[in-house]
Amino acid sequence: MKRIRKPNFDPAVVLDTCTSGINDPELATRFNAARPYLLAKFHDYERCADAHNLFSFDACSWGNETQVVVADMSKKELVDLYSDQMVASSKPGRKQYDSLMMLAPLGKCPFCGFGQVSTLDHFLSKSRYPAFSVLTFNLIPSCSDCNTGKGSSVLENGTQILHPYYEDAVVETVPWL
């Protein structure tokens, strides 16, 4: 695993950029109402990531897209914010997506060190932790093998993998195999 520089995007600006592309006025209003709750969750993420205990977040149930996650925002709405407003090439959040992809030195996957970066991995999966779907500190450039291999499991104490933005330098100097 290789450490990479943590993104320097303000989470509030990224959230606002993504929500600015929403065409449905009712949905945009609901995201605006949920904004302080999402920003509080983003702050909690940074605190937990610094302490290496992201496993402490409660995961959403598997497959229930209507589950309310934050304020009155459903799991599907939070996941769609990422896919519709950050991944889509014509949307405002795409600039942040592209900048995150460029964080991997030489375009190499920080998880395996071999594969070419081709996607962003949600460190806490968007299907289980959708509140963090557009949080740049949760989005790691990765190769498709590492992204799909990690899957969407629920983190538990003792099973949390290394986080490329939050690990100490020692991870790059100690042989792992």
Q: Model segments located where?
A:
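Short cysteine-rich loop/turn motifs with clustered Cys
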Residues: 98-119, 143
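Glycine- and acidic-residue-rich phosphate-binding/metal-coordinating active-site segment common to enzymes
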Residues: 116-177
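Short low-complexity stretches enriched in small and charged residues
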Residues: 63-68, 94-104
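Generic hydrophobic, aliphatic-rich segments that mediate packing or membrane embedding
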Residues: 74, 78, 93-96, 105-108
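Aromatic side chains
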Residues: 82, 97, 111, 165-166
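Short, glycine/acidic-rich beta->alpha junctions
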Residues: 92, 101, 131-135
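N-terminal accessory alpha/beta regions
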Residues: 2-90
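Short Cys/His-rich Zn2+-coordinating modules
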Residues: 85-98, 121-128
